[in-house]
Amino acid sequence: MTREDLPDSTPEESKLPMEFQSPLLEKRRRPVVHPSAPAPLPKDYAFTFFDPNDPACQEILLDPQTSVPELFAIIRQWVPQVQHKIDIIGSEILKRGCHVNDRDGLTDMTLLHYACKAGAHGVGDPAAAVRLTNQLLLLGADITLRSRWTNMNALHYAAYFDVPELLRTLLKASKPKVLNSTCSDFNHGTAMHIAASNLCLGAVKCLLEHGANPSARNSKSQVPADVVPDPMDMGLDKADSAMIAKELKQLLLDAVPLTCNLPKITLPNYDNIPGNLMLASLGLKLGDRILLDAEKAGTLRFCGTTEFASGQWVGVELDEPDGKNDGSVGGIRYFICPPKQGIFAPVSKISKAPDQPPSSVTSTPRTPRVDFSRVTGKGRKEKKATHKKSLSVGSLDREGLKIEIGDQVLVAGQKQGIVRFYGKTDFAPGYWFGIELEKPTGKHDGSVFGVRYFTCSAKNGVFAPPSRVQRMGGPKDPQTDNNDMKKVHQVTMTQPKRNFTKVRTPKEIASENSMSRILFCCWFPWLLRAEMKS
């Protein structure tokens, strides 16, 4: 679609053909809208886009017969070859007698709009964009002009494409007029809203330095901090974006002035308080049943500081799949639960669930979990040896599962590997897992500062604290030849945690009386089959 602003043109201009304007033409006093045209390309050209670095394309660019609409068509091509030469192409347009505020008929954008867009990092070149912008401002370019399609002015474009260099140039030329101007396409938000919603950290910092209002509200009554994307909604492949979102939101929240006369230093800060002390002050502990917002029931799995936001947060495994994650946010795992059953919330949002009285309604009883280690025929000595081994190796506090040497694990919710070491080290205090990764994405071969803790290929070794390690399956080297018992162990490991009263051993049940022995012989095979099928 084309748009011609005929009333804006003078009678002398209407006599000239729009396809060509002489470079000797005197500058017009009023801007016009140029009709759209296709981008010119050399004959037998191998590419579909215009490359100003190509000699044949340079000849077209410098040819006076190349019209302003054709040059606008070249600028519209969103490729680095064109955008890096925005200052040269813009100068050629001005040489052809174009008014500094003339518009492209296809996009309704001015040269200043295109210059701000061309400053985008990656595709454009901020230095070239600043050169053209300075030239346009000296010629009297109007910063307040908006594209009729997007309702964005030059400052909005610079904020949208995260070009702090251009923002400084524009605000220096016309700071009061456009600093807090709004845009209808972004819910009547300011340039700060536009930058915040697109995670443009550099643009937000620049706007704050020049006095932009961090408390300005859009048509939805949102301040810029409210439109920052939620890090918890980002997948594992967007860990960097999650970190930017966290920093950006905190920056905007800190910039909002306090609504009371108390200095910020008097506000409480719980970031340095351990999570267990925070829970103890509330009469809670990990594993307790809690209510979130007095509505959603779940189990408390985590309490402490996080990477996605400041302050103390609790991680809850909901009973129903009404959550947002599986216990990990931005590639960092805080606890383990099924997908869509994990959720994070401030400590103030949870309360202890009331104790449920035992129900008198008769229903089909659930199969109680049996401690199969007591029916495998192992003696007391073997049990003690196994228990001692478990204590000598690290354990992950997740449903009471032990992580042993040789187990397949997941490090930081991302990298798979096998546990080769657990214990204290010389390079850091506390207990550490030494893990041989499946891929060479580690840091060493099992030795740190000349001390060898385990042996693996170069770049396959990594150390991690127990909080960053989760078990993926049974031990790497099976401890028993009984395949059935191994399968039962793996099945019961993945079941939800249940709390029962003390389960009596088969021996205790059988020793009560003859009737108990008969019931036991009938009940135990059925129980074993049911547990294995589940």
From Swiss-Prot:
- State any further remark: The N-terminal half is dispensable for proper Golgi targeting, whereas the GoLD region is required.
Basic residues bias: start-end ranges: 377-390
Here the segments flagged for biased composition (Low complexity) are 358-367
Which positions does the entry assign to ANK repeats? 107-148, 150-173, 187-299
Q: Which UniProt keywords apply?
A: ANK repeat, Cytoplasm, Golgi apparatus, Repeat
Q: Which residues form the CAP-Gly domain?
A: 304-346, 423-465
Pfam families in the cross-refs: Ank_2, CAP_GLY
Tell me where in or outside the cell this protein is found: Cytoplasm; Golgi apparatus, Golgi stack
Gene Ontology terms, MF aspect: microtubule plus-end binding
The taxonomic lineage of its organism, from the top, reads: Eukaryota, Metazoa, Chordata, Craniata, Vertebrata
Q: What is known of its domains?
A: Microtubule association is inhibited by the ANK repeats and the Golgi localization region (GoLD).
* Function (record text): Functions as a cytoplasmic linker protein. Involved in TGN-endosome dynamics.
**Which segments show compositional bias classed as Basic and acidic residues?**
1-16
Gene responsible for this protein: clip3
Q: Where is this region: GoLD?
A: 475-534
Start and end residues of each stretch annotated as Disordered: 1-33, 349-391
- GO annotation, cellular component aspect: cell cortex; Golgi stack; microtubule plus-end; nucleus
Per the record, the major location class is cytoplasm
Q: What is this protein called?
A: CAP-Gly domain-containing linker protein 3
Q: How does it assemble?
A: Homodimer.
What are the recorded Gene Ontology BP terms?
cytoplasmic microtubule organization
Which superkingdom heads the taxonomic lineage of this protein's source?
Eukaryota
